[in-house]
Amino acid sequence: MALNREGVITKKHGLGNLIHRTTLNAKMRIDTIHGFRKLLEDGGYRVSCKRTSPRWVTSIDVKGIDCSNCFEERFLLVENRYFADGHPAIYGHNYLCGSFVRESEAQDILSYQGSFYDLLGQFLTEEVANSINTFRPAIATAPLAEILDVAVGDPLIQWQESFIGIFDHIVCRSLISFNPAYVDLTLLRKWT
């Protein structure tokens, strides 16, 4: 079942199991890889990460994050940077909705070594059930250009992700920017 779901095989009545080797060779598949460290490793890179000290902010001041239905008074901002062979590859702004953050543990986020998805489970009071993802083209602003080591005005891909808790609350909003020199976002679409 799993191999069929991942597109590695197709089961056809009368033909049996058909193997798709091209699927096995596809790198950086966002439909099967969860976590940016693993995504970059799958691309063949040596990966390092840097997480900024979390800080409380009263608004989301990043263009590109949908703030409709956002009634939080404050957010815990956590920024993640991922490096591919020492080069800046991915930069994430993550706004954890304040009313769902375990405040007594918030400063422990900096030393937390797990993935961002595991971090949400560790530091939020509501378990994440799913996320809604939107991909959009973007242009590198001066701050993003400096962070990702690209030229101002260069095209980027941005991934906006809203994390939804088990009680249908938005518990975190993120905007991730990708350096196209190091990241290919590959997605398998099954047709059979």
Which residues are covered by each model-predicted region?
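All-alpha effector-binding/dimerization core of bacterial HTH-type transcriptional repressors
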Residues: 23-192
